[in-house]
C-alpha cells in the first residue's frame, strides 16, 4: 500500500511539473512555456514572429526587448484582435517575473491564437 501511495505522489508531482501549459477546454489549444534562451534562439533565427511585452507602460518605458509590442496583460482581451490579426502567427510573450506573461498567454489562447510561446520574466 505504501508503494502505491508513493507512486501516486510521484505521478502527481510529475504531472504538475510537466503540465505547465494553458488549455482551452473547447479546442485543446495550448501555449508553450519556453526558456529565455529558446526565445532568443527564435529571435535570432526566425523572421516571422511578434514579441508581446505584458508589463505596464512605465516598465516598458524603462527598457524592453527590441521590437516588442506593449500590450499589458490586462489589455490583451480588448487589443489582441486589432493588433494581432493573424491567429496562427508565432507570438512570444514576456513580462517582468513571469506571472503576467502566463495570464496574457492564457488569454491569447482563449481568443483563438494557436502559436503562443511564453518565456517568463526578464528580471
Q: Residue ranges of each PLM-predicted region?
A:
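Flexible, polar/low-complexity N-terminal or interdomain linker segments that lie immediately upstream
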Residues: 2-50, 54-62
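Conserved beta-strand scaffold positions in the cores of enzyme catalytic domains, especially
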Residues: 31-33, 51, 68-70, 116-118
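Residues within alpha-helical segments
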Residues: 40, 69, 105-106
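Extracytoplasmic
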Residues: 46-47, 55, 63-66, 86-90, ...
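Catalytic cysteine-centered active loop of the rhodanese-like fold, especially the PTP/DSP P-loop
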Residues: 77, 81-123
